[in-house]
Amino acid sequence: MASPAPAARPRTAAPQAAIGILSAISLCHGLNDLLQSVLPAVYPILKTAYRLDFGQIGLITFTNTVTASLLQPVVGLITDKRPKPYSLAIGMAFTLIGLLLLSGAPTYVAVLVAVAFVGVGSSIFHPESSRVARLASGGRHGFAQSLFQVGGNAGSATGPLLAAFVVLPYGQRSIAWFAVVAFIAIVILSRVGAWYKAHIVVHAKAATAALHTGISKARVRMALVILMLLVFSKNVYLVSITSYFTFYLIHKFGVSVRSAQLHLFVFLGAAAAGTFIGGPVGDRIGRKYVMWVSILGVLPFTLLLPYASLFWTEVLTVIIGLVMASAFSAIVVFAQELVPGRVGAVSGLFFGFAFGFGGIGAALLGQLADSTSIDFVYKVCSFLPAIGLLTAFLPNIEPKGLTPRSS
């Protein structure tokens, strides 16, 4: 009778310790993505200051997101073999430098260099931070990924709001104030890095005990390609909102820049809520169901959006953000379970592709807007969620025994 009692204590202590780390890494994800989201939020200022067209705006997004995407799988592969606990703080230092450069960039080329620094910082941050979230999950991988992601989405929602009330009134040089946010994140990530360093050995042992799916390599590769296509459909649509929605509202409805930024904030807030809901729901009903609903299920609303009034545009974008954003946590955890023991590589690959698809999409949509109209862009993008039909070809890898308890 005495032996079960000591065994029960570690179970209660471990989750309490993990929640602190999960909260810290989620907060830093929020700070990182807040700083990332400042870039599209200040596009109207940059467009006026440097006399840019939509194609050049798209190139800014392309530069930032490609630098953020190309390094992520590489960072993930390296850290799978040899973890780098303090790379989190180093990555945020790159972001800090980029913000300071952007605040005083004398030319358009200097703007591109600055946003590249911000992108490199993000590419270093995401694979290792996702690994820390999984390590601190206590076996509740869906919940941990959801909490981690909702921090990022909350930051993405807050960035445009802060830009509307800080950068728009005070100009481009006020971007330097956001370097304070990056410094705070560096301090927190240094503490997280120390915790991570102390748990690396435990993490290595857990990786060797990873579950196997029993699915052939060919099917795993096919499933990964399908998941990437789902990320493509989701992220290209979302980047059409984050990069061009303010211009769409100003052009179609004649709203002010600040009002358009507030509409964008509402959309991003709905996306943050959807991200938080998606993880726990995926743990309960299965991640494939979440992917079905979050991508294909949003199709009727995206098809209606280009023809809606201002009021219904806001209603529809809230629904789209809430439903579509729930997909990414499910996709990442599903991919991690497809390839056990490769958390860094898988996280880097999918975060990287998410950024890369977004960057390429932003550039192409910018060119499309210049050659046609901003309204036409949203008519084209409205069909992207139809790619969600590919979810039917994903394998079933979520047996009922694969639960947090069994972990």
Each language-model region and where it sits:
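Residue-level signature of mid-helix packing/kink "hotspots" within the transmembrane helices
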Residues: S37, T65-P73, S156-A157, L268-F276, ...
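Extracytoplasmic gate region of multi-pass secondary transporters
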Residues: L39-P40, M222-A272
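Helix-breaking motifs and short loop linkers at transmembrane-helix boundaries and internal kinks
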Residues: R51, P83, G104-V109, G138, ...
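Conserved MFS/SLC helix-loop-helix module at the cytosolic interface between two early adjacent transmembrane helices
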Residues: L70-V109
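Cytoplasmic helix-loop-helix junction between adjacent transmembrane helices
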Residues: A114-G151
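Helix-loop-helix hairpin linking two adjacent transmembrane segments in secondary transporters
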Residues: F148-W195
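C-terminal membrane-cytosol helix-exit motif in multi-pass small-molecule transporters
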Residues: V180-A206, T391-N396
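C-terminal transmembrane helical hairpin of 12-TM major facilitator-type secondary transporters
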Residues: G282-I331
